[in-house]
Amino acid sequence: MFELNPNRKLYRDTLLDSDVFIIDDFYDNPDEVKDYLEHPLPPLWKQDIKQLGRHGNNGFYFEDRRLQDHNLDLMKVYDYLSILCDQPPAGRNDWVQSNMTRFIDDEYNTYDTCHWWPHIDYGYNGIVYLNYDGCNGTNIYDVVSRRELQERPADEHEEPWRDKSRYKVMKELIPKYNRMVLFDGTFPHGMNISNDRFFNHDYRINQVFFFKPDK
């Protein structure tokens, strides 16, 4: 199922001397991968924070669903991406992870004035976009207000919309069906929700991969 397309197209870009890889026509059977990721419907992510007495908005103003699974067929994909970014996987090399997100049409979701939860990860991130959409990809940021990362809530579901004045978009990664982007996740980054494409009905669906330096 996770066979790489032998005719995939690899492009290389840079951001502050860091390589950014864009691979079009990534999977040989992307429809099969998408069906695997979304059926059955994955559970809402981080619902356990309610048991800890903390407030989360997942399931109320938006749905953030994640599949966490393992599939040995994915090992060769991790190997390929690991060679490109020169970093080993952050976890097991058969780890299947997805992001499925949609929003409720409510004034809470202020995509016109806010960015969705810019954050950092251990190392390189890989994202395969699985929607026919050319707008709502991934932004890479510079943080204009250094106090922002210190003062905002620790959990992404408490106050995920962050004022645009606190961040500068350094690079926009454009989505395309069956496109893989591989970039340095130590730069602040997040979903670029730029319109209401994923409000009420359709989910924004992608598969994600995480890597980290081995030092």
Q: Which sequence ranges carry the predicted segments?
A:
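Catalytic core of non-heme Fe(II) oxygenases with the double-stranded beta-helix
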Residues: 105-215
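Non-heme Fe(II)/2-oxoglutarate
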Residues: 2-116
